[in-house]
Swiss-Prot record:
Residues 119-147 have a biased composition (Low complexity). One of its GO terms (cellular component) is cytoplasm. This is Small ribosomal subunit protein bS6. Residues 114-147 are annotated as: Disordered. The lineage of its organism: Bacteria, Pseudomonadati, Acidobacteriota, Terriglobia, Terriglobales. Binds together with bS18 to 16S ribosomal RNA. One of its GO terms (biological process) is translation.
Length: 147
């Protein structure tokens, strides 16, 4: 079953642009020959790392959006693991995230609809109670006697 994955990896900051392009094209070729498709490649540039990784404080971020089988992703991760230029990587299955967000949105919409219905019912009850609470006799114009 084809699923969508995001693979983000960080490469050494001292890597040249040619070496980075070579690494990216190697991974693209590997994904293509394994039967997967690359939806997008986003080179996010050089950024500071949150903590030191392998004596590096900066890294160049690359984000792949891949559609393919789990075995393909396993092979991509294996290749990233053995590359000396790659200092960190993470893979996320996007379709699971989309399902979770859809579920949260459905729950939120249900709650909003429930609140809207409840508010409408309360307003209708208040309008119905308002005429009943009004006095039946008009107030007299004469002031009440002082005691």
């Amino acid at each position: 079953m084809q699923r969508t994955y995001e693979v983000m990896f960080i490469v050494r900051p001292d890597l040249t642009d040619e070496d980075l392009d070579k690494l990216v094209s190697t991974l693209e070729t590997q994904v293509g020959t394994a039967g997967g498709t690359i939806k997008s490649v986003d080179k996010m540039g050089k950024r500071r790392l949150a903590y030191e990784v392998s004596t590096f404080t900066d890294g160049m971020y690359i984000l792949f959006t891949i559609e393919g089988e789990g075995a393909l992703i396993k092979e991509v991760e294996r290749r990233l693991r053995v590359q000396e230029q790659v200092i960190k990587f993470i893979t996320v299955r996007v379709d699971e995230e989309q399902k979770r967000l859809a579920k949260v949105k459905a729950i939120r919409d249900t709650k909003v609809r429930g609140k809207g219905t409840r508010a409408a019912e309360q307003a209708a009850a208040a309008e119905a109670a308002a005429p009943a609470a009004a006095p039946a006799e008009p107030a007299s114009a004469e002031p009440a006697p002082a005691v």
